[in-house]
Amino acid sequence: MNFRNKYVLAIDQGTTSSRAILFNHQGTIITLAQKPFQQYFPKPGWVEHDPNEIWYTQSSVIKEAMAKADVTDSHIACIGIANQRETTIIWDRETGFPVYNAIVWQDRRTADYCEELKSQGWAERILQKTGLVIDAYFSATKIKWILDNVKGIRERAERGELCFGTVDTWLVWKLTRGAQFITDVTNASRTMLFNIRTLQWDQELLDLFTIPASMLPQVKACSEVYCETSTPIFKKGIPVSGMAGDQQAALFGQLCVEDGMIKTTYGTGCFMILNTGKEPVLSQNNLLTTIAWKLGDQTTYALEGSVFVGGAVVQWLRDGIGLIPNASITEQMAKSVSDNGGVYFVPALTGLGAPYWDQYARGAIIGITRGTTAAHLTRAALEGICYQVYDVLMAMENDIHAKPKEIRVDGGAIANNFLMQFQSDICRCPVVRPNVLETTALGAAYLAGLAIGYWKDIDELKEQWCLDKVFNPQMKEDTARKLLNEWHKAVGRSQNWAE
């Protein structure tokens, strides 16, 4: 097929914004369009989105990206989707109307129910089947909450009238006007309902959470032609041929395609993923075992550490307490002081993720004196992101009994040179920043393009990976060790805080 003058459209549906990016055959960004959407916090610990607003903003940026590039449908070879994971949407199979707001991955309303499951002895069984720890983070308890708490919904679900999907499923449903009800293995692996060994929905877990199997989408590989669009956005059908959760898409976009390669994404949260190859490695250190991707019949597995609050702590400094006017000033502020002034910021604003998994931890700023300035607080917030990533890296090293050669990084925050240098200093490891920062979208584009032959194979993709900068450790090792000791003291103070 002739792909001359054709582009791949990547849909990158994130936690705070919807984006659409057009890539050319060299993996270069042609245009990018982005639109934020409303975050809803109905109660403390609750986080919701409006599914219709997700679709409205996503369809809007698709049109904007195409208009910016002055391209028509005939210039789009295929579409790839990357999405925020775990976020749970339930809608009516006939009308397509959501029955409740999307419950976002950060939402903690089911924390007490998760504790009940642990006390009933389900932790090991769920770990063996799904690779996951029991936590409100994943979709299963969110689905159950909607079925149990929204009037009339359980009865409708049992009559087969409702669909559940993560955001990828919702987008494909909308792109095909309800003709396709599918997900991919990476998104399925984050529901706590999917058996990562059999690659099937697990009936025992469906029974545990009292979720009717009829609600669940068909599970597909990450790179295959699923369908063609049938939405007014496009005048003709365009193949939808790649799909993965955002962190797995970023791992693929970074071309961490060999065992032992590792990447960290700095977004709303921070997510470190290590490619473990063809076999799942069950963590002994509170990490998640997940599916990296499935190409054809071959499934690749990964270890993941999820940090709930990464870049969101900077958002909180700006919007929550008005300490900074914008995110870009944080690098300058952090560098304006020689150290953190003894201040440690544990950004457990929605609990602590890996490796602590403390749903009742809360944010803490410790070590404040009369000499503490806004610059110290800002620096402590950035350092807090890096310390959390360090804790995940140590858990990974203990699981695989090896140190990574380097950490590839992506996400909006990696433009912050202070953050990247401090990360290298603390981890005692090179931090590698690529030329293309939009690796989540690039991964979705690669998966879609491979399925239709736009790119021949992974070797062709490897030739496109391009380095921007390597950050090597500069801090003395004993200084790093002292900082980490203080950090771990601060974490201890923040744990088990909420009732």
Swiss-Prot record:
Which GO terms fall under biological process for this protein? Answer: glycerol catabolic process; glycerol metabolic process; glycerol-3-phosphate metabolic process
Its Enzyme Commission number(s) read: 2.7.1.30
What are the alphabetically sorted keywords of the record? ATP-binding, Glycerol metabolism, Kinase, Nucleotide-binding, Transferase
**Catalytic activities:** glycerol + ATP = sn-glycerol 3-phosphate + ADP + H(+)
* Cross-referenced PROSITE patterns: FGGY_KINASES_1, FGGY_KINASES_2
Q: Which GO terms describe its cellular component?
A: cytosol
Q: Which residues bind ADP?
A: 15, 19, 268, 311, 412, 416
Q: Where does sn-glycerol 3-phosphate bind?
A: 15, 85-86, 137, 246
Give one GO term, molecular function aspect.
Answer: glycerol kinase activity
The metabolic or biological pathway listed in the UniProt record of this protein is: Polyol metabolism; glycerol degradation via glycerol kinase pathway; sn-glycerol 3-phosphate from glycerol: step 1/1
Q: What protein family does this chain belong to?
A: Belongs to the FGGY kinase family.
Q: Protein name, please? A: Glycerol kinase
Which organism is the protein's source? Parabacteroides distasonis (strain ATCC 8503 / DSM 20701 / CIP 104284 / JCM 5825 / NCTC 11152)
